């Protein structure tokens, strides 16, 4: 059961324990479900049924139950592939905060120029420039920087109303210089607005925050809603909050800003109507791998559930699975092989894709990193070759404006064997296929970094025998041959 086009309404929460078709509506702080002015429309609720799981993945039912685009001009809305100052905090244990000297911050009063820096703050000029250089070298569009703004010392767990102003940088983050440096390299910075769930505070600062983005050249923001809501007693999925999430998107559109909301309500297809809602988290993403880990089957289920309502900023691309290598105090492990991390860029649809690991880990595996560099984030066509929720998904997508295809497979605990018929390719063309696959001894827990790369010629008559190990997968780039001289050095791939 799914819901679409939630506007001016509450979110429906299914009973996923008893597996019966009963549900509850998310109330407000007073226990009321909604305040509706008549005449009004309630959201669509649907049930999708098929005897072939691929049909559900290919369905556009939820998008089509939403209204067409509200914007006359969408030329400013662009797909984004990005890296960011984030994983070293989430997984590496580094702080968003600038100092340990201020246990209680007062906006406008606390003087950060008089405190002692903790020396561990990653959102600093030198580190951000390193990320900008890496992005420019490898063709990424943007660099996210979290922890750039004052207020992180006491941001969580205090039910604090005036928590951030979304405008004042820490002393070690030169917002003007860094934006100019990024733009000189052909890269943009991505803004970060963590609200600490203080919605009133975000809305009182929103216009100035968006204007600041315009002033410095930002065109995308990652927003966050961690914690208990303010106004106190409101819920993440109630009517009032759903109206806020949409308000943040429509106000951003006035400034030509794209929004990637984390911890917000699960999307219901509104990205068709408001396409600057370029991404959402709204499910267990890769960050949970740094906490307790996601089960291997997790990413074989999400495309049937969460992603039916809109693209997900899953933040894949982790190459170092042992979190103790980044943070000695961590016992967490990413439940995936390296090849599977590549496949997620195809199976987890989003026009906003992050290469989430730190640059140093990519530099250790540059041959595998090539797939992340090559894979598009905008597509003309999608095909679902094999699918069984909880077990495996094999997706193929055609790059926007080209004849190139990309294939991704993610598997659960059982692994998966495939014979991929490439009959969706053009009959009169030849292609170079580069296969990134699990090594023979690969395993998501014991040997996740074992992978192999092979390359050869394929056509529409080709059939590739593929294997994904437990918690593994594979990724394939299929590039149209335009220079026939390359044929001399390659054999047909099987």
Identify what each model region corresponds to.
Residues 357-406, 410, 443-447:
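Glycan-recognition and catalytic regions of carbohydrate-active enzymes
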Residues 147-333, 337:
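Aromatic- and carboxylate-enriched substrate-binding clefts and catalytic-loop regions
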Residues 388-431, 474-477:
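Carbohydrate-binding surface patches
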């Amino acid at each position: 059961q799914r819901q679409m086009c939630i506007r001016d309404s509450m979110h429906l929460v299914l009973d996923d324990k008893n597996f019966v078709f009963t549900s509850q509506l998310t109330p407000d702080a007073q226990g009321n479900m909604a305040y509706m002015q008549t005449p009004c429309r309630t959201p669509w609720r649907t049930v999708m049924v098929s005897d072939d799981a691929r049909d559900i993945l290919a369905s556009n039912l939820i998008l089509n139950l939403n209204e067409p685009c509200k914007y006359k001009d969408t030329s400013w809305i662009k797909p984004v592939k990005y890296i960011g100052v984030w994983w070293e905090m989430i997984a590496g244990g580094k702080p968003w905060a600038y100092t340990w000297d201020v246990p209680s911050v007062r906006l406008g009063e606390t003087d950060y120029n008089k405190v002692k820096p903790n020396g561990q703050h990653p959102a600093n000029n030198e580190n951000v420039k390193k990320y900008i250089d890496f992005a420019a070298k490898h063709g990424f569009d943007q660099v996210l920087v979290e922890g750039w703004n004052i207020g992180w010392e006491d941001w969580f767990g205090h039910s604090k109303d005036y928590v951030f102003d979304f405008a004042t940088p820490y002393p070690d983050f030169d917002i003007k210089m860094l934006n100019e440096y990024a733009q000189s390299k052909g890269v943009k910075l991505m803004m970060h607005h963590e609200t600490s769930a203080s919605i009133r505070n975000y809305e009182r600062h929103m216009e100035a925050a968006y204007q600041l983005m315009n002033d410095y050249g930002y065109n995308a923001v990652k927003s966050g809603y961690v914690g208990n809501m303010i106004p106190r007693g409101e819920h993440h999925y109630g009517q009032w909050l759903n109206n806020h999430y949409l308000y943040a998107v429509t106000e951003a559109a006035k400034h030509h800003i794209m929004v990637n909301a984390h911890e917000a309500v699960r999307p219901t297809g509104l990205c068709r109507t408001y396409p600057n809602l370029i991404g959402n988290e709204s499910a267990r993403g890769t960050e949970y791998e740094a906490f307790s880990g996601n089960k291997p089957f997790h990413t074989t289920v999400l495309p049937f559930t969460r992603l039916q309502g809109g693209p997900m900023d899953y933040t894949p691309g982790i190459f170092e699975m042992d979190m103790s290598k980044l943070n000695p105090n961590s016992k967490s492990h990413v439940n995936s092989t390296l090849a599977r991390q590549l496949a997620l860029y195809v199976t987890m649809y989003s026009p906003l894709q992050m290469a989430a690991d730190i640059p140093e880990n990519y530099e250790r595996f540059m041959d595998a990193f090539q797939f992340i560099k090559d894979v598009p984030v905008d597509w003309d066509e999608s095909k679902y070759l094999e699918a069984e929720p909880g077990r495996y998904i094999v997706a193929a997508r055609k790059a926007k404006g080209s004849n190139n295809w990309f294939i991704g497979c993610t598997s659960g605990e059982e692994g998966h064997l495939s014979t991929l018929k490439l009959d969706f390719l053009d009959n009169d063309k030849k292609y170079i296929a580069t296969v990134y696959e699990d090594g023979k001894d690969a395993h998501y827990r014991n040997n996740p970094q074992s992978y192999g790369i092979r390359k050869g010629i394929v056509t529409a008559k080709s059939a590739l025998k593929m294997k994904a190990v437990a918690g593994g997968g594979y990724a394939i780039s299929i590039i149209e041959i335009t220079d026939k001289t390359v044929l001399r050095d390659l054999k047909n791939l099987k």
